[in-house]
């Protein structure tokens, strides 16, 4: 092999890069373990304190658990800006560790839809003409079953029902007068609406992004999904779904506030500091807790700085100055700083400061008009990037509301100033706002006005002069990005397009931990089985394949981390499947080398020719599988995309390691004169010299397959499927009980409860389904009750109906808060999903499109690659045959087998994976047929095909067995969540292997033979 040195160098560098990427995950876990040890010390110290003796026995466990969690969180917050690994802070390390999906980590996945229908109405100033209303209604109706965005659908509907009325008459409102002129064409008006929609979606995205930052979760994710108006939010580890729903769907509240001067408030802060010291000292239990906090701080300081501090002096200062120990006053060099900022605090201390300032005894010290608010971004005055400014807001109105809200802002944009060319923000207001703004700026010349969104301060510029006319320029040392962010904030105050939750998934941390354990166990077992199988079958060469497999796993995980890919439970299934498929390339190569050795070639020549002859089959097979992975990634979402990502990356790393790593090892051994064994006495002549007439038996297999396909179609037509909630819409809950329960009893109780609620509220078409999920103490409950209503009140109502129906089935009393909370609660709702009907239709439509596109792409690739469309037809027929029988199996055995066989996104992922895997078999066989036709051009087609099928039997069986072994490991040890996926893949492997030999190839032969006979008849 040429360039061995370069390949070896690249492999070493790639391995080093992967180890470097994975090292961040290791360091992160080390720091988290230290946090746990630190938290344990805090728990032990509290157990030995006088305060612990006063805690009721029933509350002691909860109290200690709370201290453990809070201490661990406090430790990690404290080191977030500390360098813990080669110059990287803990925060940076955490950002670079491997991302776990919600199904492994627990948390919440939410898809929000920006309601463009409301935006279009608002831009028309809620036009009430019948034609406009009809066009809106028609566009809304069509949006359910269309991939077009709402504005395109509205444009089409207006052309149908508008009666020739120009859109300029509808949208030429006072506020839109600068953008829509009387002479504007319909196309120009639609273009304006699109720009406003894009702005509204962008503003909603920014509002949501900043709200998410306030949850304090690690590695949150938010992404805008094209121009659909949908925003996907992932919050790993969040444990308060109700709070998330309310905060994400809340209306953006933009306000303008006057401010106090720091010098006006500082004396009151000093008084508050003294009063807090007295309050905390008066309460003995609070004192003990504060002492413990001081000890915790000392422990942490020792661990981080490794130097001794005067613990007693520090403790005394904290007791005497509790507020100033966490809030640094805006006092520098003994002088009170100018401006509205009254102090600085670490992010982890802001909640404590808020709590203290709200205490009645403390609140009474400050002026009645005083309202403290935090900046949304860290202060630039304090290094570290984790310190925020506390600003003194002045409430001048009688009702305590802001003197001016964002509803008066008509536009905000970034422009460049006349002096210096720095970015600045230009803001325009309507007539009402202009008058109020003139009064407000006139009263605060030389002072600062705070721009507040959702209770957080985005900017508080100084007023230079009274501003009249409603147009203002906000200047500062803005970067372009900062100026754009501020402009978006100002525009968000007039957001006419609310965002509502249309899809939601909640996974409790306990279920996530169980999924991790199950996934890791299945991965390790599958990995060991594959390693063992390769050694048993191929001896020394099998050991070399195992080395390549180890490198493959390293490269695969390293690549996943470097790309920031999210590892999900289906993703682990993809990893395990990759292990099985990774050895396929080695099997193809080894079988080729064995053929060359049997032909009498020397070891070195056999290896060279074996690799050369195996390349085309390996590349073609892996490309077809990768193509289905790409289709799956494009049309899938969430965990399905995670599965596709690991599959695609795994295919690439598998090809590289199986071809290059093994070849380097073989060449080195050959160069040193060492022997390499490719078999043992049991496997040496395995399936060699077989003379099976496969094509002669095709009529029998046609009958068998035809019967199975007819049975599948009948089951699909008459029995149908058990659809997952992502295909039907509705809400699904996995509920864990503290005892074993009967599915029939749960079904009866839940159905009765939801039917009663439906009758009481005049809700139609309510369906309820209950299935055992895992053990006898877990049930999966799906309901379509109020599926079309998406408010948080309905979510709470559904959970309450479910709670009332199920609370009698718990041995221990459980409150509704305990039942619905995923906060480390072992029982009650441990996971939930909500899918709106529009999203369900989109998912179902995309699934069907994905399957057909995959088949078309594979047909085209094989037809082009083998230069004959009949070969593509044979391959696609084999795939369709496999898919139909697997789908029929899920239809027929749903409700019969003791595990769920739902047809959902994961099932579609399995079907597409089966298509990608099964075509691999076809490609290897077709490649051998092509080779035999080249070697024996005068032989009959039937003879060449039978010879090719017999010669590839060993490869086909070995690949199928290794892949089956890993899939069985997933099915047995992978847990309930992915068992259905594993079953589908096992069926697909078995049926796909059969179909590639007995269906795809015979179909190709029959069609090719018919064409040849037809040509022969014409030539006569």
Spans of features found by a protein language model:
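Transmembrane helices with small-residue packing motifs
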Residues: 15-49, 90-102, 113-123, 688-739
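Interfacial segments of transmembrane alpha-helices in multi-pass membrane proteins
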Residues: 2-4, 425-426, 430-445, 449-450, ...
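Juxtamembrane "pre-transmembrane" interface segments
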Residues: 234, 469-473, 481-525, 529, ...
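Cytosolic juxtamembrane regions of multi-pass inner-membrane proteins
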Residues: 580-624, 667-675, 891, 897-959, ...
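Hydrophobic alpha-helical transmembrane segments of membrane transport and translocation systems
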Residues: 2, 8, 12, 551, ...
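Small-residue-enriched core segments of transmembrane alpha-helices in multipass membrane transport
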Residues: 12-15, 543-564, 575-582, 643-658, ...
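Non-transmembrane, solvent-exposed regions of membrane trafficking/translocation machinery
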Residues: 19, 23, 27-31, 44-462, ...
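Pore- and gate-forming transmembrane helices of large, multi-pass membrane proteins
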Residues: 208, 510-530, 549-550, 581, ...
């Amino acid at each position: 092999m040429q360039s061995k040195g370069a390949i070896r160098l690249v492999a070493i560098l790639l391995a080093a890069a992967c180890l470097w990427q994975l090292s961040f995950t290791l360091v992160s876990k080390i720091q988290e373990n230290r946090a746990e040890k630190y938290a344990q010390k805090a728990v032990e110290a509290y157990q030995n304190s006088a305060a612990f003796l006063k805690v009721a026995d029933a509350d002691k466990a909860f109290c200690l658990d709370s201290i453990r969690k809070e201490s661990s969180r406090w430790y990690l917050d404290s080191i977030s800006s500390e360098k813990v690994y080669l110059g990287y802070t803990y925060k940076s390390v955490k950002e670079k560790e491997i991302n776990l999906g919600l199904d492994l980590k627990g948390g919440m996945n939410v898809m929000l839809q920006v309601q463009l229908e409301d935006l279009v109405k608002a831009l028309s100033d809620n036009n009430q003409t019948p034609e406009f209303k009809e066009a809106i209604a028609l566009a809304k109706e069509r949006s359910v079953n269309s991939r077009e965005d709402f504005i395109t659908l509205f444009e089409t509907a207006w052309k149908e029902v508008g009666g020739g009325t120009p859109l300029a008459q509808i949208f030429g409102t006072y506020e839109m007068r600068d953008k829509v002129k009387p002479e504007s064409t319909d196309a120009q008006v639609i273009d304006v609406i699109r720009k406003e929609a894009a702005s509204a979606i962008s503003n909603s995205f920014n509002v949501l992004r900043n709200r998410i930052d306030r949850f304090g979760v690690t590695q949150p994710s938010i992404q805008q999904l094209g121009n659909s108006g949908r925003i996907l939010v992932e919050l790993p580890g969040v444990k308060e779904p109700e709070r998330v729903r309310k905060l994400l769907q809340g209306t953006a509240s933009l306000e303008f506030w006057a401010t106090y001067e720091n010098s006006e408030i500082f004396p009151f802060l000093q008084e508050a500091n003294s009063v807090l010291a007295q309050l905390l000292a008066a309460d003995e239990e609070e004192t003990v807790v504060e002492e413990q906090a001081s000890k915790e701080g000392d422990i942490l300081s020792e661990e981080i700085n490794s130097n001794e501090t005067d613990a007693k002096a520090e403790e005394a200062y904290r007791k005497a100055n509790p507020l100033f120990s966490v809030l640094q006053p805006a006092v520098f060099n003994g002088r009170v700083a100018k401006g509205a900022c009254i102090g600085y605090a670490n992010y982890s201390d802001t909640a404590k400061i808020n709590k203290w300032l709200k205490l009645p005894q403390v609140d009474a010290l400050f002026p009645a008009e005083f309202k403290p608010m935090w900046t949304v971004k860290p202060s630039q005055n304090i290094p570290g990037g984790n310190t925020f400014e506390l600003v003194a807001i002045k409430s001048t109105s009688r009702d305590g509301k802001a003197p001016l809200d964002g509803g008066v802002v008509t536009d905000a944009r970034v422009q460049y100033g006349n002096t210096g060319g720095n970015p600045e923000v230009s803001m325009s207001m309507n007539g009402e706002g202009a008058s109020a703004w003139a009064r407000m700026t006139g009263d605060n010349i030389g002072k600062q006005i705070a721009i507040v969104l959702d209770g957080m301060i985005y900017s508080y510029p100084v007023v230079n002069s009274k501003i009249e006319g409603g147009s203002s320029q906000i200047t500062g040392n803005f970067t372009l990005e900062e100026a754009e962010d501020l402009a978006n904030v100002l525009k968000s105050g007039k957001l006419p397009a609310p965002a509502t939750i249309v899809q939601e998934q909640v996974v409790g941390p306990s279920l996530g931990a169980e999924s991790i354990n199950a996934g890791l166990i299945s991965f390790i077992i599958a990995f060991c089985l594959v390693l063992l199988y390769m050694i048993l079958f191929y001896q020394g060469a099998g050991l070399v394949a195992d080395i390549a497999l180890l490198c493959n796993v390293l490269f695969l995980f390293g690549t996943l981390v470097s790309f920031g890919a999210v590892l999900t439970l289906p993703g682990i299934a993809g990893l395990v499947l990759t292990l099985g498929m990774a050895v396929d390339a080695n099997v193809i190569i080894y079988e080729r080398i064995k053929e060359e050795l049997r032909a009498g070639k020397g070891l070195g020549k056999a290896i060279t020719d074996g690799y050369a002859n195996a390349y085309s089959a390996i590349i073609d097979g892996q490309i077809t599988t990768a193509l289905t992975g790409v289709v799956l990634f494009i049309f899938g979402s969430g965990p399905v995309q995670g599965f596709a990502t690991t599959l695609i990356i795994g295919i690439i790393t598998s090809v590289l390691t199986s071809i290059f790593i093994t070849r380097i090892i073989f060449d080195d051994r050959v160069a040193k004169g060492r022997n390499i064994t490719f078999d043992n006495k049991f496997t040496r002549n395995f399936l060699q010299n077989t003379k099976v007439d496969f094509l002669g038996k095709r009529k029998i297999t046609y009958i068998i397959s035809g019967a199975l396909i007819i049975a599948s179609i009948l089951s699909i037509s008459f029995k149908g499927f058990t659809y997952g909630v992502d295909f039907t819409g509705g809400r699904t809950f996995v509920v864990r009980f503290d005892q074993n329960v009967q599915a029939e009893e749960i079904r009866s109780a839940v159905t009765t409860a939801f039917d009663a609620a439906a009758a009481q509220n005049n809700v139609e078409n309510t369906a309820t389904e209950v299935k055992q999920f895992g053990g006898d103490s877990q049930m999966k409950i799906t309901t379509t009750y109020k599926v079309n209503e998406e408010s948080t009140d309905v979510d709470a109502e559904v959970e309450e109906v479910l709670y009332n129906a199920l609370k009698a089935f718990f041995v221990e009393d459980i409150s509704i808060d305990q039942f619905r909370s995923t906060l480390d609660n072992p029982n009650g709702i441990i996971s939930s999903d909500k899918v709106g009907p529009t999203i369900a239709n989109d998912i179902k439509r995309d699934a069907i499109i994905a399957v057909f596109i995959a088949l078309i792409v594979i047909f085209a690739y094989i037809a082009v690659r083998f230069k004959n469309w009949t070969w593509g037809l044979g391959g696609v027929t084999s795939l369709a045959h496999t898919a139909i029988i697997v789908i029929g199996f899920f239809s027929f055995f749903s409700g019969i087998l003791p595990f769920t066989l739902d047809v959902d996104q994961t099932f579609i992922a399995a079907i597409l994976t089966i298509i990608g895997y099964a075509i691999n078999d076809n490609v290897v066989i077709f490649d051998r047929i092509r080779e035999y036709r080249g070697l024996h051009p005068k032989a009959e087609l039937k003879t060449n095909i039978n010879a090719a099928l017999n010669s590839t039997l060993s490869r086909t069986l070995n690949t199928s067995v290794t892949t089956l072994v890993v899939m069985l490991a997933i099915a047995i040890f992978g847990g309930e969540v992915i068992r259905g996926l594993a079953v589908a893949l096992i069926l697909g492997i078995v049926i796909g292997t059969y179909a590639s030999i007995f269906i795809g190839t015979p179909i190709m032969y029959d069609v090719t033979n018919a064409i040849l006979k037809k040509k022969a008849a014409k030539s006569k």
